[in-house]
Amino acid sequence: MIASEQSLKTERKAKMRKIIAAACLMAAMTLCVGCSSAKDGSKDTTKATTETKMKVQSKYKVPKITAAKKTDQLADAQKGETIVTMKVKGYGEMQFKFFMKKAPLAVKNFLTLASNGYFDGQIFHRVINDFMIQSGDPTGTGTGGESIWGEDFDNEVCEELLPLRGSLCMANSGADTNGSQFFIVQAKADTAKKGLEEGNVELTKKQQALFLDQGGYPSLTGSYTVFGQMINGYDVLDKISGCKTQDNGSGEVSQPVKKVVIEKMTVSTAELIRGKQVVIC
């Protein structure tokens, strides 16, 4: 009887060790943006914490945000729509529009942080060519940062918004752990094609066609909030992605040898003049 109980205890301990090991492996994988398994991108899985339950910290002033009348990821920013200009020292500027109606928490969080100077002076601590560039951590280590509420907030995922090339997404360490870190997808069409061929995520034919045409990283679909899209500056994105990198201390060659610094983020409104986008602050 004692031997049986001891055997059972030993078996339980062995199982627990396996569970802990698996949990640690999953945690390590999800800490790296794009390594976690993607969810079904063909379904609308939008989920957001009720904002009334969260209070913006008093140190942040929320800017006026004007949303686009219609959510269209690849359309030009419309007149009066809120946009951001991200000036990267030595590289140039990138501009982004936002999807307030589909990702209100992520958009409000990002624009508030940007307008309060939170991102100014921060670095792109993680750069992987043909994948993405990541920033939003004041410590520059990939382990810091906070939301305007001082706590994590939920993912906001919908089938209309995909991790296409130029998409602005929230970085996380697992579902519903969004803070201040973000990444910009840089992968081009050939990389997207390889990703689709691997078949790691279920996508509709329309979604697949968008990846093949625009580029992006299919396996990220459903696991990360897409809350913005680049409207200008793809050449800057590619230049940053092509910078020389080194081991980040964890075995991943993703840390820029020379710091890539966000000099300034400016929140403004878009204007269309003769079909060309210009910024009016």
What are these regions (language model features)?
Residues 5, 23-25, 50:
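Short stretches within intrinsically disordered, low-complexity N-terminal or propeptide regions
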Residues 2, 27-30, 55:
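Position-driven detector of the extreme protein N-terminus
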Residues 1-15:
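Short, Lys/Arg-enriched N-terminal segments with co-localized hydrophobic residues
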Residues 7-10, 27, 39-40, 45:
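Intrinsically disordered, low-complexity serine/threonine-rich segments
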Residues 17-37:
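Sec-dependent N-terminal signal peptides of Gram-positive bacterial secreted proteins and lipoproteins
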Residues 35-281:
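Cyclophilin-like peptidyl-prolyl cis-trans isomerases
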